[in-house]
Structure formats: C-alpha cells, structure tokens
Amino acid sequence: MTQFSNLPIFERARILVVGDTMLDRNWSGLAQRISPEAPVPVVNIEQQTATAGGAANVAMNIAALGGQVYLCGLIGDDDAGAVLRQIMREHAIGDALSVCALPTITKLRVLSQHQQLIRLDFESNRYAECAHLMAVPFNRALPEHDLVIFSDYGKGSLHNVSALIAQAKAAGKWVLVDPKGTDFQRYRGADIVTPNVAELTAVVGHFADEKTMIAKARACLIDAGISAFLITQSEKGMTYVTAQQHYHLPAQAREVFDVTGAGDTVIATLACALASGYDCESAMIFANAAASVVVGKLGTATLTPTELHHALAPRAAKARGLVDLSQLQEQLHYLKKQGKTVVMTNGCFDILHAGHVRYLEEAKALGDCLIVAINTDESVKRLKGADRPANTLASRAAVLAALHSVDWVISFAEDTPADLIAAINPDILVKGGDNRVDDIPGAQWVREHGGSVRVLSYVDGFSTTKTLQQFLSHHEKD
C-alpha cells in the first residue's frame, strides 16, 4: 500500500466522464419576514452563484485534483447550457456537451443563512431520446483516456450505458460507475460501482448489520457481473467488496456541513488514483479522505491536492510512527485555521500500560487532536538511568501511534520539551500526576500565548517502574 507522506500526484490521470450533466444555481439572502400573500418566508436575494453539477461536478473534481479530464453529456440550447459550457472552459476541462432540444438540467436552491429553503428543478423526462447524441464524441474520446466514469443520475443520458461499458472494457479501460436506480444489471462489466447505503438497499433489500450488507452486496455484484462495489456509508466510512474479499475503512472524523456532491468527489478521487497507478486500497483511502474535506463545504464543491494531502497527514503520521516538526507545524497551521483545538502532552512512555491509555484518551477528549512528545533514548537514559528505556524510540512511537486517541508522535532530545512546546504552541498542554502547573515545562509559554494547562490524574495501580520490577522478578524466578 502507498505511503501518504507526499503530495498525491494525479497529473498522469486521463479520465473520460460520461453522464447526466447539470447546472447548480444557488440564490442566497436574508429571510426576515413572512409574505402577506401566503405563509412563506420572503428572501431578499443578495447573491447568485452557478456551479457545475452531476457529471460536470465529477469532471470539476478531477480537474481540481490535477487530472486530465474530458466530459461527454447533454445540454440544452439555453442560458444554463451556455453557463455550464463556460464553467468547463474556465477550468480547462475538455468537453463534448451535445446540444439537444430539451432544457439543460438545472437545480435552483434558495438559501438563507446557509439553510436551504426550497429547491426548484428544471428538467425533462425525455433525455433518453437524446442519448444517441453522445455516441460520436464518446467514440472519439475513448482511445485517448485510461479510465471512464459513468455518472448516472437517472435522467436518461446513460440510457445506453450497458453498450458504452462494453465498448470501454473492449478497449481495455478501467470503468467506474456512480449508479442510480434498482437495475444494476445495466452496469455489467464495470470494475467498481459506488452505491451509497440507500442506493444499495434499494437493490438488495434491507440489511441489519455490516455482515449482512456485505453478503447481499457480494451476491448482487456476482449476479450483475460487476467486479467490485465501493459502498459509501456516510459517518460509518466506506466498504470495498469483491466476490472474494472485503475491506472497510472508517470515516475520518470531520464536521459535516453539506453532503451535496460528496459522491462525485469520492468517485473522482478514486478515479484519479487508479488512473495514476495507485492500488485499490490506496485509492479508497484517498477517496475517503477527500470526502471528509468536501462535506465541510457548502454545496457542490471540489478539493485541491494540498487539501487532500492535509487530510491524509494524520494517516501518514500513524504509518511512520514519528513525525518531524516542520511537517507537524504545516498540518497544525491548517487545522488552526479551521478553528481546531490542539492538545499536547509528553513523557517517556517506555512500557505502555492501561493507565497510559486512559490518560491519553482523557487528554484527547479535551480537544480535536492530540500530540504526544516523547523523550529520545538518550534523554530517557539521563532521566531514568542507564538501563532505560526498555523499548527503543521507534518502538515506543509505533505503539503510541497505533492508539486511536493519538494523532501525532514527535520526539525531543532535551531533558524537557519546553522548546518543542514553544515551537508547536498547543492550545492545551496536559500533564499527569501531582504536578504543579507552575512546575510543568512549557506551561508559562502556553499560558502567555493564550493557551491553558491541565493536570490529569493518573490511574491508580499502574507504573512503568512497577511493571518492569514485576517482569524482572518473574524472570528471575523462571
């Protein structure tokens, strides 16, 4: 599996997006009174925006991540179609938007103080009649791309999706599908189909637990001739299922502001990673991290490689065990701009026991992320004696990094972490035991810079020294 310490590079990805293209319009303003004509709010519109939606939003996400993308879809000979085409040009997205004698699909949302009051849809139920218009541009674009995404919103543009998938597979292309409806047989031959829980339930029926979901999903994909499902499960994360195996990835904890278009971001990121040569598990991790970012934005949104890199940073730190100061400072700058609370503690953590685990869980609960600074081996020897530490720095860091409560582990060679604390400048500094706040290294700096210092009680009955003595005693008896 890929290491995640470097910025993801997707510029080699050549992706063809085919599907239901839409224009999302947002009108926002203040709603401070009720209409005298009917019991409805009156909104004084102050701002109007237009963004790409549906398959066009998938293309926007790919372009934002640095991939090369080409869009095939339908638009009407109208203002909305012209706006959508202009958005594609502004973002250097190649397109073959075929003009049909029907209106461009448009979603108009009226909002006040970020709350959606109403959505008005402008569309027809006859787009299937125009689906043949995409055949020629699809045939021309297919040889120039490595992967094809079919973005199905059930509007009719993908009326002939089965034939298009067969054509793409015959050409040796990756095929990903964001599905709609209850007939997954239409997607026969696809490499990965990405239903959410509601979409999967509509096809396989109700399931009470993860095990049943996986069993039903597996039976469905085998029957439909699909290689794999990537099931998005909102706050539960996502699950990758094939005929032989499954893999679950928990969601990254983030504040959810708006889930509009999150599925587009997932499939776009997955496609960029696969088309760039990453393995399926790494691509899934990228997609999961991307979703955690985009749900914190209003409306259909995209993310940049830098945002994705920051979202992946905690996982990279976990994988390495130790993180260096410059990387940590970069990540903390990003988090503090988001208003996150950074907690820091320190210690030798030579032999991790239940008392340590409880202490670190309590420390993490004080904020959004926890940094654990640990003494180097030489520093431990100076503090504890020549026979310590029992475990090397790398071993201690790896064990700490494996804890759910710990976000980053960093080392310091000095006898105290005062300089490191000043460099990190946490919002909350935590120590355990009977320490007086004034005696805690770095406490004065933290308080002078607007932070706070907390002393947490250790759990009775646990001690590294006591644990070592008991081990040596038992060893001598043996």
From Swiss-Prot:
The active site is at 264. The keyword Nucleotidyltransferase applies. ATP binds at residues 196-199. One of its GO terms (biological process) is ADP-L-glycero-beta-D-manno-heptose biosynthetic process. It is an enzyme of class 2 (transferase). One of its GO terms (cellular component) is cytosol. Keywords: ATP-binding, Carbohydrate metabolism, Kinase, Multifunctional enzyme, Nucleotide-binding, Nucleotidyltransferase, Transferase. GO terms for molecular function: ATP binding; heptose 7-phosphate kinase activity; heptose-1-phosphate adenylyltransferase activity; phosphotransferase activity, alcohol group as acceptor. CDD domains: RfaE_like. It comes from the Bacteria. It catalyses: D-glycero-beta-D-manno-heptose 7-phosphate + ATP = D-glycero-beta-D-manno-heptose 1,7-bisphosphate + ADP + H(+); D-glycero-beta-D-manno-heptose 1-phosphate + ATP + H(+) = ADP-D-glycero-beta-D-manno-heptose + diphosphate. The keyword rRNA-binding does not apply. Its EC number is 2.7.1.167, 2.7.7.70. Residues 1-319 are annotated as: Ribokinase. Pathway: Nucleotide-sugar biosynthesis; ADP-L-glycero-beta-D-manno-heptose biosynthesis; ADP-L-glycero-beta-D-manno-heptose from D-glycero-beta-D-manno-heptose 7-phosphate: step 1/4; Nucleotide-sugar biosynthesis; ADP-L-glycero-beta-D-manno-heptose biosynthesis; ADP-L-glycero-beta-D-manno-heptose from D-glycero-beta-D-manno-heptose 7-phosphate: step 3/4. Residues 344-478 are annotated as: Cytidylyltransferase. In the N-terminal section; belongs to the carbohydrate kinase PfkB family. In the C-terminal section; belongs to the cytidylyltransferase family. Catalyzes the ADP transfer from ATP to D-glycero-beta-D-manno-heptose 1-phosphate, yielding ADP-D-glycero-beta-D-manno-heptose. NCBIfam families: cyt_tran_rel, PRK11316.1, rfaE_dom_I, rfaE_dom_II. Homodimer. This is Bifunctional protein HldE. The lineage of its organism: Bacteria, Pseudomonadati, Pseudomonadota, Gammaproteobacteria, Cardiobacteriales.
